[in-house]
């Protein structure tokens, strides 16, 4: 028996060595951890259960039959994050550059199936060069199997992709179909075709960083949801993200102990909104005063900064936060902000995460660039997302809620359950100045008359009590009481039941 156990230990040590000391050293020299080191950091100590440790590829072309490493370039299994089960796979760049073979794909699909079976989140760590070209179409078939499972798991279990090195070619499409993409600055890249191919085909010279680095994908393409400085920070933040998420679409939001009293009143909120309606303020100050311990985990913080999206807790339970940001473009909705918020709202609705919407929106951004870029359809995405959502939704209007943007931002008309407004709220088709200049165009040359008519319009149409009189606002509240009101509303809505007509699926305006 001793000999058998010694053989097992030898085989495990061989698998754990990956591509060998030289390649591991090269990985560390780039500031990157190995596949196994990443899993150890991501999961609770001692919780990782590895599967398919000894799987090897079956390729016999191009001399591959003499080049085999146990595990075949990906480490798979399951473990826990703060005691909650998660499934994980981590591509090993030290073995065949982490490239995907038929058996490599089989290991991934096996744990994808496991995640669906136990209804637990799955986290994929990517550091690879794409398909293993020695296997040809077999590798492509493997990709297809992975992609199909990504689609089947969507909306059933949370899927998180962590890009910690190159992610090119077919490898990019699996992360693109997951719920969240995390990148590491300076060491991670995502692109369909790399700089060399771009140069050959288009004669365009571009670096890997400028083509598909973390900065590009967090600020321009919106492919990535967040980026961090190194592997350690990224994995610790993924652990934090997992803590906010339900295990699956029927598990309910996680609840953590909170020592932040839900009855807490914040006097500072009574003076948060400036007297001048054109003076900006930071909506994150309001978020910090309303949620537990001021803790907001932002999603896509560097993209479309005129709207804020992220996870927080109220009364220890996860909520999704969507908030216009007056500090950036006055909080206006544009194509990027609409897409960003729509995707976030859809995710929350998939996983029964209640949504808190904080509104200060002067309308949609005008201009040819927006219209040519499809603002109508992008704005409709957010409208569609809110209209289809069945989770508890609470809305607070702090200042402006003008035009179609008022409807879009979780108004009572599109299905929000509880709608509050601060006394500073202005709810109308447009601001007083613009409205008066249209209605009383003939008086534009008379400054005194325009000023008088503007004051009259403000008193008659911009007051939140006009909307409250019609039941569009459930209550006009003191700003200091916002946390208490919101917390009690969400507690009341826990038993919410909502029915939608049967359909195979909806047809969101993509």
Predicted regions and their residues:
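Ligand-binding clefts of soluble mixed alpha/beta catalytic domains
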Residues: 1-510
């Amino acid at each position: 028996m001793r000999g058998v156990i010694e053989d097992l230990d030898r085989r495990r040590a061989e698998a754990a060595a990956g591509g060998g000391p030289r390649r591991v050293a090269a990985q560390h020299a780039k500031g990157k951890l190995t596949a196994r080191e990443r899993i150890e950091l991501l999961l609770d100590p001692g919780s990782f259960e590895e599967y398919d440790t000894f799987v090897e590829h079956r390729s016999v072309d191009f001399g591959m039959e003499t080049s085999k490493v146990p595990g075949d370039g990906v480490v798979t299994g399951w473990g826990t994050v703060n005691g909650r089960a998660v499934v994980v796979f981590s591509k090993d760049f030290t073995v065949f550059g982490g490239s995907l073979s038929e058996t490599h794909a089989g290991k991934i699909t096996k744990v994808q199936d496991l995640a669906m079976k136990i209804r637990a989140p799955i986290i994929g760590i990517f550091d690879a060069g794409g398909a293993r070209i020695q296997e040809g179409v077999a590798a492509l078939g493997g990709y297809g199997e992975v992609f199909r499972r990504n689609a089947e798991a969507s909306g059933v279990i949370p899927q998180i992709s962590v890009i910690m090195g190159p992610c090119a070619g077919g490898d990019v499409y699996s992360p693109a179909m997951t719920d969240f993409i995390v990148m590491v600055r300076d060491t991670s890249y995502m692109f369909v075709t790399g700089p060399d191919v771009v140069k050959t085909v288009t004669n365009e010279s571009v670096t890997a960083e400028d083509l598909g680095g973390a900065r590009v994908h967090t600020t321009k393409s919106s492919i990535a949801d967040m980026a961090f400085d190194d592997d350690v920070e990224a994995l610790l933040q993924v652990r934090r993200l997992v803590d906010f998420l339900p295990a699956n679409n029927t598990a309910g939001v996680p609840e953590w102990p909170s020592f932040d009293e839900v009855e807490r009143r914040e006097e500072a909120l009574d003076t948060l909104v400036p007297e001048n309606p054109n003076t900006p303020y930071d909506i994150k100050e309001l978020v910090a005063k309303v949620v537990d311990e001021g803790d907001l985990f932002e999603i896509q913080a560097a993209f479309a900064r005129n709207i804020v999206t992220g996870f927080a807790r109220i009364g220890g339970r996860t909520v999704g936060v969507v908030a216009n940001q007056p500090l950036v473009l006055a909080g206006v909705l544009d194509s990027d902000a609409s897409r960003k918020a729509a995707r976030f709202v859809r995710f929350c609705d998939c996983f029964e995460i209640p949504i808190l919407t904080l509104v200060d929106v002067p309308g949609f951004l005008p201009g040819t660039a927006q219209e040519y870029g499809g603002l109508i359809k992008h704005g409709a995405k957010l409208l569609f997302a809110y209209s289809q959502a069945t989770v508890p939704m609470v809305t607070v209007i702090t200042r402006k809620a003008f035009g179609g943007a008022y409807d879009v931002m979780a108004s009572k008309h599109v299905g929000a359950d509880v709608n509050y407004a601060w006394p500073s709220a202005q709810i109308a088709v447009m601001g007083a100045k613009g409205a008066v200049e249209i209605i009383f165009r003939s008086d534009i040359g008379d400054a005194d008359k325009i000023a008088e008519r503007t004051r009259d319009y403000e008193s008659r149409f911009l007051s939140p009590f006009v909307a409250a009189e019609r039941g569009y606002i459930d209550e006009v509240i003191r700003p200091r009481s916002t946390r208490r009101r919101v917390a009690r509303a969400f507690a009341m809505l826990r038993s919410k039941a909502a029915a939608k007509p049967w359909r195979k699926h909806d047809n969101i305006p993509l």
